[in-house]
Amino acid sequence: MNRGNQQKSAHVTTRRLLDMKEKGEKISVLTAYDFTTARILDRAGVDVILVGDSASNVFSGHNTTLPITIDEMIYHAKAVVRGVQAETSRAMVVIDMPFMSYQLSSEEALRNAGKIMKEHECDAVKMEGGRIVADTVKRITDVGIPVMGHLGLMPQSIYKYGSYRVRAQEGREAEQLLEDAKLIEQAGAFAVVLEKIPSKLAEEVTAQLTIPTIGIGAGSSCDGQVLVINDILGLNREFRPRFVRRYAELDAIIDGAVRQYVDDVKSGNFPSPDESY
């Protein structure tokens, strides 16, 4: 893959992620939806940038991830890939396949995965589901498209489950999740996201898989962690889930900066002579 960049750096690949798991080196994953954020994340050393269907929530303001379309996802992915290419080109870029872009049939899933890979230089696609998508994962990986799986809380199934509660807390559900993880691995997935499941279960899944597990609300035993960039930066004052650690409070900082700008414009304090031609 030709990635023009300013500072050449070893690009993270699926093989590299497997090596990281084998060596016990944790994998860092964050979401991005635009050029500027992707540049910063790549520069800061994030291993994997996920172009998440969470863009439906944090970028477009929808209540769920369901409304976002494949063309909208491709739009975001193109911007993210350009951002990575503008920096070190190190980060792997993975794009979520949106709701109903892969559920109808393996043929349609393959066609849409191919469309995603052809229209921008991302590295892989991500799909939610266990045994129900295993055949589709195999079909897609067989033609050379890397697939990341996603188990536990699956936001695209929110109307089926009715809430964002922790998943797989009961014995049979936990057993099924472990079985699903193994099926996804056997189908050819190179990694799997485990979202909002008990830490002990995530630890067991991680131990039994040879592919990396990426946790979100799944404890510290996973091979890596993923969070939504808006959440760690504190861009939503009202959203404070237990599994998110905030590293900044940008909502308040941006609010203060904008208010100062408005005041300076209203008072005539901006622009100053030094800011004029």
Curated annotation (Swiss-Prot):
Homodecamer; pentamer of dimers. Binds 1 Mg(2+) ion per subunit. Keywords: Cytoplasm, Magnesium, Metal-binding, Pantothenate biosynthesis, Transferase. GO terms for biological process: pantothenate biosynthetic process. This is 3-methyl-2-oxobutanoate hydroxymethyltransferase. The keyword Nucleotide-binding does not apply. GO terms for cellular component: cytoplasm. Pathway: Cofactor biosynthesis; (R)-pantothenate biosynthesis; (R)-pantoate from 3-methyl-2-oxobutanoate: step 1/2. It catalyses: 3-methyl-2-oxobutanoate + (6R)-5,10-methylene-5,6,7,8-tetrahydrofolate + H2O = 2-dehydropantoate + (6S)-5,6,7,8-tetrahydrofolate. Its cofactor is Mg(2+).
